[in-house]
Amino acid sequence: MGRRRGVMSDEFKYELAKDLGFYDTVKNGGWGEIRARDAGNMVKRAIEIAEQQMAQNQNNR
């Protein structure tokens, strides 16, 4: 079974890494070099953004 294709674009992931303060780690060592805590915070922030967008879309109806 192949790996599941990512839902987040690379551009969005880099933007989150910059916002959360570990972009230099990604730039210098790749995504495999980030801490599990940083990866978790990135997913948490992505979910928050998605929820905000969904709420905004629902309010615009």
Swiss-Prot record:
Keyword line: DNA-binding, Sporulation
Protein family (similarity comment): Belongs to the alpha/beta-type SASP family.
Keyword DNA-binding included in the entry's annotation: yes
PROSITE patterns assigned: SASP_1 (PS00304)
GO molecular-function terms, A-Z: double-stranded DNA binding
Organism encoding this protein: Bacillus subtilis (strain 168)
Name assigned to this protein: Protein SspF
Gene3D superfamilies: Small, acid-soluble spore protein, alpha/beta type-like
Function (record text): May play some important role in either sporulation or the dormant spore.
Lineage, broadest ranks: Bacteria, Bacillati, Bacillota, Bacilli, Bacillales
Keyword Mitochondrion applies: no
A single BP term in Gene Ontology: DNA topological change
Residues at the site labelled Cleavage: 15-16
UniProt xrefs under InterPro entries: SASP_alpha/beta-type, SASP_alpha/beta-type_CS, SASP_sf_alpha/beta
